[in-house]
């Protein structure tokens, strides 16, 4: 999926802050990181503005959303195209964080354990 296609699909709107930006101020973010089994398909990609992407850093989407309630509301409203399994994983991690439970390892999609 081309980044321009992701931006157009998301109407050039950051899924975290809800603001519209010109394409040169946007980046593509993986909901399920590639290191955790995520892929480069449109169902795993969202549009993020530069400031939100910097604030998120290397944290998981759920860790970022847990720390930023307004971003969590925007994500839930704007990330409707994200595959349900990825949305469930984000919501499960948010629920675990809210309960103070330790995070369990995320299963890698499409990989085998050695």
Regions flagged by a language model, labelled:
Residues 108-114:
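C-terminal, charged low-complexity interaction regions
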Residues 6-7, 101, 112:
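General helical structural elements
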Residues 16-47, 56-68:
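Histidine-centered nuclease catalytic patch
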Residues 5, 31-32, 51:
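N-terminal hydrophobic or amphipathic segments with adjacent small-residue motifs
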Residues 41, 51-54, 72-75:
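Glycine-rich loops and low-complexity Gly/Arg-rich segments
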Residues 1-16, 73-93, 97:
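Short, charged surface segments at domain edges that flank catalytic/cofactor-binding sites
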Residues 50-68, 80-101:
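Long, charge-rich boundary regions
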């Amino acid at each position: 999926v081309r980044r321009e296609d992701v931006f157009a699909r998301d109407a050039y709107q950051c899924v975290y802050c809800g603001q519209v930006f010109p394409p040169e101020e946007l980046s593509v973010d993986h909901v399920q990181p590639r290191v955790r089994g995520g892929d480069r398909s449109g169902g795993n990609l969202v549009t993020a503005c530069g400031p939100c992407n910097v604030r998120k850093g290397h944290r998981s989407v759920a860790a970022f959303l847990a720390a930023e309630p307004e971003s969590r509301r925007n994500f839930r409203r704007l990330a409707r195209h994200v595959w349900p399994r990825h949305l469930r994983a984000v919501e499960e991690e948010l629920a675990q964080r809210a309960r103070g439970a330790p995070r369990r390892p995320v299963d890698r999609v499409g990989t085998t354990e050695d």
